[in-house]
Every structure is written in C-alpha cells, then in structure tokens.
A protein has these predicted regions:
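Active-site anion-handling motifs in enzyme catalytic cores
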Residues: 1-379
C-alpha cells in the first residue's frame, strides 16, 4: 500500500517529461535540470513518499511555497555543495519559507581523492544552515550521499543534522535479492552494451570515451544522452544549434574525424538515445546485457533493472556514491587503455551478498531518517 503524506509538498521538478516528443534539445535539457539523471532520484523519492504528492518548483517565490497547506517541504538534492555553485539566492528564499524542511540525497563535489574539503561560498553555508534550522527537533533532516559530504557538513557545524544514506534511487527496485539477479545476469554472454555518455568537455575521459564509443558500435549498443544541452541537441539532430567549437570537441571525445562533421552527425543518429521517464528508462536497459559509463544514475537505473553495470568514478560525487552503496566501479586509471567487449567483464567487481546487505543496511537507516522527520514511506 502506498503511503499517504498529506502534510508534504515536494520542492522539485516533475519525475517525467510528458511532452518530451514535442520539445527541442534545449527545452529537454531545461526540463530535467541540466541532467536527465536527476529524474532517477526524483522518481525514487516520489515513489517512496507516496503517490501524487503536490509539487512546487524550488525556484518559486517563498510566498508561493508558503501558500501551500502542507507543513513539510521535501527537497530532492544533487551535488550542490562545492566551489562550483553558490546557493546564496536559494538560501535567501529558504530563509522565508515557513515550513519544516527535509533534504534528501545532498552531495559535495570535489576531486576524486576526497581528501580536501571544499571551501563553500558563503551563500552555500547559509543554505545549509537554513535547512539545519528547519529540522524536526533534534532529528537529522539532511540525508547526504556519503561520509565525505558528511565531513563537509561537519566543517560548517551542521553534521548533527546530516546522515549518510547514499541515493534513494538505490531502493527503486523492491527485490531484496537484487544483487543475486545482477550477478546471474553478469554470467550471460555480452551481446549489446549501453553507455551513459560522459560530458564531451571532460577531456580527462576522452581516451576511455573513445573506446566506449567503439564498444557501442561493436555491440550495436546505445549512447545515452544525460547532459549537457548540446548532447540533447545532437540527439535531436539540431546541429545548426550547436556551435562549431562544441561539435569539434564532440568529435574529438569519440575519436571521430574533426573535419568530417557528417560522420559525427551520422554516428549520433545511429547510436544516441535519451529517455525522460524512469520506468521507461529501466525497461529500455533490459534490452542490453551490460552498462558502463561515467554517469552514476545512468548506471544505477540499469542495476535497478537487474542489468550489470560499472560506473567510471572520475570525481568525488560518483566515487562517494559508489563506495557508499557498493556500486561496481572503476577509476579512469584502471581502464586507461580503454575497454573492449572481451575485457569488459574483467572490470566487473561485484559481490551480490555484500550489495544486498548494504542495500538492507541503508534501507533501514533511510527508514529511520524518514520516520524521524515524520514521513511515511514505502521501501
């Protein structure tokens, strides 16, 4: 039975882009908050807290949020903490929100060594404190992706309001023995491979990405667009909307001839895909035997569908989530020479019992977190 949280309003974008067939690439990118992977954790939270929860965009004026009759605002979060983003504007708005607030899935972004803690902009520090001041008494009301992000909260004096739970998308599939299903699938022949595409400007991954593009070709696989705008435009074949420099970099990232734009355009037409509904995304993943790429949520949705996957953990946000949730991963240096169909399986380091035990542990902690915030749930 689905839970009823009549006292809850979600501050987030929708879980799906219903009018995706009618949108151009730029509008698709805007609809998913600049990364379609965001749909994974928004869908998870929506499913876990109940059907048809009222929803208000985070960017709405505080007066609009306050006009909703619910007493608790739940905010699905991404990797907001870091030098890359100043949350001053949102902190100013949240200071005027007259509700208890709960953040789910907050992450910090830094280099993959996760030793140095970022010096947050003052606006982001204020943002954290606005959440901390709107907790349910002493109960933690900020779920974070892992111990690294928790240390960032500690640096700014709000660690008592945080708890490390990974990402709610870990619990989309209700199967308590999901790990064994993934392990069994990993024993099957690898015929088709899906790759959640990296950002074409991530030069440190270009050598790996070239090999993944070749892997897609060799297995009649697919190259899934998640971010940025230009990749959705390429998926839509809106090449006249993509500047020449970006097209050049897109070609270099895949090892395609820089001057032969027709070759690049044909490749994207043949292999690119994009999905804007999470159940449809997971169902699509079942058409493939393996998934590998630098997008944690692209890999996560495959795993939730029972399809083996490997995340290329190239920064703190991906590494932290993989380590917290026992998601199979490699570092870029591990596959510096690239990946082929014949070597792919050798990089899949996965213990189904450890994975299932970690899911159970985090599910129990997640349930306690939700209960502490007065939220009913289905996990």
């Amino acid at each position: 039975m689905s839970p009823r949280n009549d006292h809850v309003v979600l501050l987030s974008s929708p879980t799906t882009v219903d009018d995706a067939p009618f949108r151009d690439g730029a509008a698709l990118n805007q609809a998913v908050g600049n990364n379609s992977g965001n749909l994974a954790f928004i869908h998870a939270i929506d499913k876990q807290l109940g059907p048809a929860l009222p929803r208000v965009r985070r960017a709405e004026k505080p007066e609009t949020i306050n006009q909703t009759p619910q007493s608790v605002a739940v905010v699905p979060c991404a990797n907001h903490l870091g030098v890359h983003q100043d949350l001053a504007g949102e902190a100013k708005n949240f200071a005027r929100v007259e509700k208890r607030m709960v953040a789910i899935g907050l992450g910090a972004q830094a280099h993959a060594n996760m030793t140095d803690l970022p010096d947050l902009p003052e606006g982001s520090v204020r943002w954290l404190k606005e959440f901390a001041e709107r907790s349910n008494g002493d109960a933690p009301n900020i779920s974070v992706r892992g111990e690294y992000t928790l240390r960032v909260l500690e640096k700014y004096g709000v660690a008592d309001k945080g708890v490390a739970l990974g990402c709610p998308s870990l619990h989309i599939n209700p199967d308590r023995e999901l790990g064994s299903k993934i392990a069994a699938a990993a024993e099957q022949p690898i015929r088709r491979v899906a790759v959640p595409s990296a950002h074409y400007r991530w030069r440190h991954l270009w050598k790996v990405e070239k090999s993944l593009g070749k892997l897609v070709e060799d297995t009649h696989g697919t190259y899934i667009m998640q971010s940025p705008k230009e990749m959705f435009q390429a998926y839509r074949a809106e090449w006249d909307q993509i500047d020449d420099e970006s097209q050049k970099l897109m070609a270099e990232a895949l090892g395609k001839p820089v001057e032969d734009r027709e070759s690049l355009h044909d490749w994207y037409r043949a292999y690119s895909s994009a999905i804007f509904d999470v159940p449809a995304w997971m169902n699509f993943m079942r058409d493939f035997d393996f998934v590998i790429g630098a997008r944690i949520h692209g890999v996560m949705l495959a795993l939730q569908a029972g399809v083996p996957g490997i995340c290329i953990a190239h920064d703190s946000r991906t590494l932290e989530l993989c380590q917290t949730m026992e998601i199979p991963y490699v570092r870029p240096a591990d596959i510096a020479d690239g990946v082929t169909k014949s070597t792919l399986r050798s990089f899949f380091r996965f213990d189904p019992e450890v994975f299932d035990a970690k899911r159970a542990e985090l599910r129990t902690k997640y349930a306690a977190f939700l209960e502490g915030n007065g939220l009913k749930y289905s996990l």
